[in-house]
């Protein structure tokens, strides 16, 4: 196993998860309107889960003898604070971090069962998040998936 590459990827995951904590917390503060309470609760839950994911990534870094990053990944924001824009940004964030968990899995597959299972578990969790956001972006009775660019899959 290429330990340096694994540590680099785990630190990137840590940074992206921390960006998600900031992102979801910020947007929970910016939601207005009659649907505010359930949306804010969902955003708070996403922030809390992101923090748990970040902590676990940091633990793995230190277990492997590395130093956890203090950096925070890129923060996406349209500054419109429209629920649709917030959800599209969430979808982009989930897709980005999901890609990194797959890259981690490729780095450790067949070499470290603990890291392999960690990557698989987080792939499942992030896929569930991505699918939940996708459904939230659909219009009532819309069965087709929403795509990041705002186009429907035909």
Regions found by a protein language model. Name each.
Residues 1-154:
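Iron-associated oxidoreductase/ferritin-like identity signal
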């Amino acid at each position: 196993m290429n330990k340096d590459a694994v540590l680099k990827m785990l630190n990137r995951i840590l940074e992206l998860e921390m960006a998600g904590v900031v992102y979801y917390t910020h947007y929970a503060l910016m939601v207005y309107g009659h649907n505010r309470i359930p949306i804010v609760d969902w955003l708070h839950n996403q922030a809390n889960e992101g923090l748990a994911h970040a902590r676990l990534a940091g633990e793995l870094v230190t277990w492997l003898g590395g130093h956890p990053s203090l950096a925070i990944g890129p923060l996406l924001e349209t500054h419109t604070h429209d629920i649709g824009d917030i959800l599209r940004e969430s979808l982009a964030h989930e897709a980005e971090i999901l890609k990194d968990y797959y890259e981690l899995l490729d780095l450790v597959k067949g070499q470290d069962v603990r890291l392999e299972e960690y990557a698989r578990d987080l792939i499942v969790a992030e896929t569930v998040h991505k699918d939940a956001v996708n459904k939230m972006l659909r219009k009532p009775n819309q069965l087709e998936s929403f795509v990041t660019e705002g186009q429907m899959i035909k």
